[in-house]
């Protein structure tokens, strides 16, 4: 029987510790992990809970992140509630097994403290690893601060383990900016948190010897297509479950979450779209510009990167007077438009208004995104809206040292 962990009504936790506390409250059976900056404190925290008797689960220390996710796959297939944590190069090493986990429909929870991918080597936060996982078949949920890192980790178990979903879930938080920043967090009592998540009810667990099953079977052109189509459908169908889980969490805590968060969009003529901790910076900048210059600025932030909430983004754009929309990607685009820009463009294309769309690459390797820079971008969007066309390159690098870097101009007759 696990010992009780004393919690105050308000704790001062960073995002990593908040996530580790959520893992403890979920009473996980197995964590298989290989530590890497900046997510190390998550698994360190879990290891200390096990060592000190605060949880009855197993902490398996392995030789690599590939082995960590492999261990998670085995434990989940055996019928356990399983989680781990990683970042950056560790995430990259896991990628092969991420596809195994989702293809086998195993509801593992992976807490990711986002960090830049080498080379050059960098331990600071951007969204390179988050974007790397976008086609892996996992649900991806984003936290903007430490409170949300705690809340979203709890929700991740309830979403992934739902029998209508049965898919693994990533909970993303910005490395250092969220993972290491201490903030007020309002935790649930252990029994309340566990009741919210519920007992794990595995499906087709391998340790049920009365009902032998096969996991990870080989399929070729005869059935592979159908398997992947069903997996995609399950991911898309999870949208309803995510909404239901968020609604239940609101009823329990009063904290409301949506698959897409929007701020001041009702009358916004220009808007920024971005992810993670930068959302709070952008909201502050928008409020200041509204007060100082009367500029009608709004913010859109998808909380669920997968399944991507195209319908909700479309409705937010359609229901606002927005004329210019800027998508900010915190990852090197590698010779193309940013991933967030591409997703938002798909949603915006289905609207009748079709606002002007631009793409900013920002914050790579942890480069600071300041309020003044957010205001500069907003003013540039206002210039586009006033002119009725994009007055700069469609894609620009924000906060870059040296000459301005931009690509792809619109053609005007």
Where are these regions (language model features)?
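Peripheral docking tails and interdomain loops at the edges
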Residues: 329-413
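Redox- and metal-dependent alpha/beta enzyme cores, enriched for Fe-S-associated oxidoreductases
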Residues: 265-295, 308-315
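Glycine-/acidic-rich phosphate or pyrophosphate-binding loops and their flanking alpha/beta elements
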Residues: 12-19, 247-270
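Short acidic, glycine/serine/threonine-rich loops at helix termini
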Residues: 42-45, 71-74, 94-98, 119-125, ...
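Conformationally flexible catalytic loops at phosphate/diphosphate-handling active centers
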Residues: 168-261
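Short helix-loop-beta junction
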Residues: 47-52, 284-299, 349-350
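Conserved thiamine diphosphate
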Residues: 124-168, 172-175, 353-367
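Thiamine diphosphate
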Residues: 1-132, 137-138, 154, 402-405, ...
């Amino acid at each position: 029987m696990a010992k009780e962990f004393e919690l105050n009504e308000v704790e001062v936790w960073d995002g990593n510790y908040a996530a580790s506390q959520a893992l403890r409250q979920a009473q996980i059976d197995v964590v298989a992990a290989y530590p890497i900056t900046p997510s190390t404190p998550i698994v360190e925290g879990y290891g200390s809970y096990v060592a000190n008797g605060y949880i009855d689960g197993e902490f398996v220390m392995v030789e690599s992140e590939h082995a960590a996710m492999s261990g998670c796959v085995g434990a989940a297939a055996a019928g356990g509630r399983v989680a781990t944590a990683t970042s950056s190069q560790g995430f990259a090493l896991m990628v092969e097994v991420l596809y195994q986990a989702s293809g086998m429909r195993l509801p593992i929870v992976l807490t990711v403290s986002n960090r830049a991918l080498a080379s050059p080597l960098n331990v600071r936060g951007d969204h390179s690893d988050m974007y790397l996982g976008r086609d892996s078949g996992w649900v991806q949920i984003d936290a903007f601060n430490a409170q949300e890192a705690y809340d979203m980790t709890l929700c991740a178990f309830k979403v992934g383990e739902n029998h209508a979903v049965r898919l693994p879930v990533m909970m993303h938080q910005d490395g250092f900016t969220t993972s290491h920043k201490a903030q007020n967090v309002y935790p649930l009592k252990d029994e309340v948190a566990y009741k919210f998540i519920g007992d794990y009810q595995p499906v087709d667990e391998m340790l049920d010897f009365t009902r032998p099953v096969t996991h990870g079977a080989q399929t070729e052109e005869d059935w592979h297509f159908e398997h992947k189509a069903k997996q995609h459908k399950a991911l898309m169908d999870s949208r309803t479950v995510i909404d239901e889980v968020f609604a239940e969490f609101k009823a329990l805590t009063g904290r409301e979450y949506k698959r897409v968060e929007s701020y001041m969009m009702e009358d916004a003529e220009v808007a920024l779209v971005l992810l993670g901790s930068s959302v709070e910076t952008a909201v502050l900048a928008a409020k200041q510009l509204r007060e100082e210059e009367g500029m009608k600025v709004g913010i859109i932030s998808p909380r669920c990167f997968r399944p991507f909430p195209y319908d909700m983004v479309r409705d937010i754009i359609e229901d606002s007077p927005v004329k210019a929309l800027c998508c900010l990607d915190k990852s090197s685009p590698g010779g193309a438009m940013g991933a967030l820009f591409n997703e938002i463009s798909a949603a915006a294309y289905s609207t009748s208004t079709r606002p002007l769309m631009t793409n900013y690459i920002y914050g790579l390797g942890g480069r600071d995104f300041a309020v003044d820079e957010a205001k500069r971008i907003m003013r540039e969007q206002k210039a586009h809206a006033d002119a009725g066309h994009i007055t700069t390159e469609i894609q620009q690098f924000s906060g870059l040292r040296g000459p301005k870097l931009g690509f792809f101009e619109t053609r005007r007759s």
